[in-house]
Structure formats: C-alpha cells, structure tokens
C-alpha cells in the first residue's frame, strides 16, 4: 500500500474492525490504473469453481457444527480462503447451496456464455482488462470494493490474521495488532 501510518499503537483505529483498518489506506488511492470488468471476471471464476462442486461441498462440510448445522459466516470465510475469491463472490457461491454435490451445468453455461461473448467481441483481454479502441483502457480511478477486498484478503492470509477480520484492535493481542499494522 502506498499509504503508511505507524505510531506507537500501530496506527490502528480503535473504532474500526481489522478489515476496515487494513482497507482504509486502499480506499483512498486514486491514480491512473487499468480498468477491469469484474462482473465478467467473477462470472468466469464462478463457472470455474462450479465445474467442481465436490470441492465446494468438501469446504462447506468443514463448516458444520456438532449438530450438523452449517455456519454461514464460517463457510463464507472458508470459501474465500479455499478459492481465493472476494467476500462478494464467496456469498454468491454460498447462495448456490452446494451442501450436497449436484449437476451445475445449467448454472455454468450462462456464466461461460457471457464471458465468451465479451471475449469474442474484443471487449476484454485474457485477464479481463477492458479494451477501448483496440488498446487496454486505463483511467484515473479509485479501487473498487472487489479489488480492495481481494487485496485485504491476500495480505491477511500472508500475515495469518484472516480469522480476526471482524474484531476490533482492543480485542487482539499485541502480536496480532502488530500483524494487522504490517498488513
């Protein structure tokens, strides 16, 4: 991140959760950068994940309590970590209710068709960057919620604090606060 504050108390705002503390600096970046079509990127990623519903079922089975009830919050976090997706994509994935594996070809086909149509029309590159006038498009912009979420989740995995994202700094030990500041 280009914004860095480091004070005696690791510059963690006490009224913001760990997630909000990490994303704060990212939300303030505004510069020229490539423009991506995240709707299509997420559609392609969902199609890829849904093509292997047994993997999703395996992850969801790990999120059951002693009575066999599925913990939605834990499931979303596990999906984020297992498939490296944002929380928004993980919630969409959870909404497919893949607790039991089933044939997902009916859901995969429209997702793939949408992505293939955009690629055939030459609207996006392989990495979903928007193309205008035959060139990848850049603009002065802020990071989208999706980009911020992916960045926050990536750095939280690196410093091993992904399980503390909804906690406040006062609820963390000194070492955990230090890892949040590093992230």
Describe the predicted segments one by one.
Residues 144, 163, 168-172, 176:
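Conserved ABC ATPase signature
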Residues 24, 28, 32, 158-161, ...:
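Conserved amphipathic alpha-helical interaction elements at protein-protein interfaces in regulatory
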Residues 20, 26-30, 83, 94, ...:
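A short, conserved alpha-helical patch in the ABC ATPase nucleotide-binding domain
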Residues 31-39:
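Flexible, disordered linker segments and immediate boundary regions flanking tandem C2H2 zinc-finger modules
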Residues 38-64, 77, 81, 102, ...:
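Conserved ABC ATPase "signature" region
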Residues 5, 11, 160, 179-183:
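ABC ATPase nucleotide-binding domain "signature" region
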